[in-house]
Amino acid sequence: MTADPTLNLAAAAACFLGIHIFISGTRLRDGLVRMIGEGPYMGLFSLLSLGAIVWLAMAFNRASEETFTFLWAPAPWWHHFAMTAILVAAILVVLGNVTKSPTAAGGESALEGSDGNDDGREAGDAARGILRITRHPFLWGVLLWALAHVAMNGDLSSLIFFGAFAVLAFIGPMLIDAKRARKLGDRWDAFAARTSNLPFGAILTGRNKLRLGEIGILWPLVGVGLYLALAFGHEWLFGVSALPVR
C-alpha cells in the first residue's frame, strides 16, 4: 500500500476499473472461461472484484480523513437535484436486480424462446418492463448515484472514488453488449434491436413501447424504501448526513 492516501485511492480505483474493463470486458474473459469454466471464473472474478471494492472503500475513507481537498463548493440547490437523481437511481438499481435480463450476469436464459418479434408479447421475449426503457437499468442507476455524489461532495477523494463507479457504469453497457453479441449471436441481435442502452431510446425511435404496467408498483416502491432508508440512515452508516442542513 502506498503511503500517500490520495495515490493509494487512485491505485485502488485503477485496480477496480482495470479488472472490469481489461479482464471482464475483453476477450480475455472468453479465454479464461474456456480454460477453467464459467462457474470457476465467476467465483474467482467475484472474489477479485470484492477485494478491489474493499480496497477502494478503505482507501476512500483514509484519503477523506487525512487529505481532504475541496475542488469546488457545491451550491445549496445542488443537494435537491442530487437527492432526486439518487431516488431515481435507487429505483433503477432495484428494478435492475429483480428483472430477468440477458444483460445480467448469467442472464442469457432470458432470451430462450425469443423469436425476434418486437411487440414484447411473445413467450420468452425479454424486452419487457424496465428493459423497454433501457437494457441496462442497474448501471444507469449506479451512474446517477455516482455522479450525484461527485457533484454534491466536491472534493478530490469523492471525485476519484465515485468517479471510478461512474466510469465503469458509463463504459459497462458497451462492454456487456459486446460480450453478449459474441456469445449469443442472432438472439442478442434480436433483443438489442428492440431495446436501447440510452433510456427511452428504443421507445422514441419506435422500436418498443412504454408499458408501465409491466413494471408494476411493488418494486418501484421498494426502490423508494431503499432510498429513504439510505437517506435517513446515511449518517449512521457512513458518518455523514445525507439530509439538507437547515
Regions found by a protein language model. Give the residues of each.
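Membrane-water interface of transmembrane alpha-helices
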Residues: 19-25, 91-111, 175-190
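Hydrophobic transmembrane alpha-helices
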Residues: 8-18, 135-246
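Membrane-water interface of alpha-helical transmembrane segments
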Residues: 3-6, 10, 39-43, 72-83, ...
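Membrane-interface helix termini and inter-helical loops of multi-pass transporters
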Residues: 29-32, 62-75, 236-245
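Alpha-helical transmembrane segments of integral membrane proteins, especially early/N-terminal helices
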Residues: 5-13, 39-55, 132
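Membrane-interface helix-loop junction between the first two transmembrane segments
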Residues: 21-40
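Portal/gating segments that form or line small-molecule/metal binding sites
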Residues: 48-131
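Helix-boundary and loop/linker segments of multi-pass membrane transporters
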Residues: 1-3, 34-35, 73-74, 117-121, ...
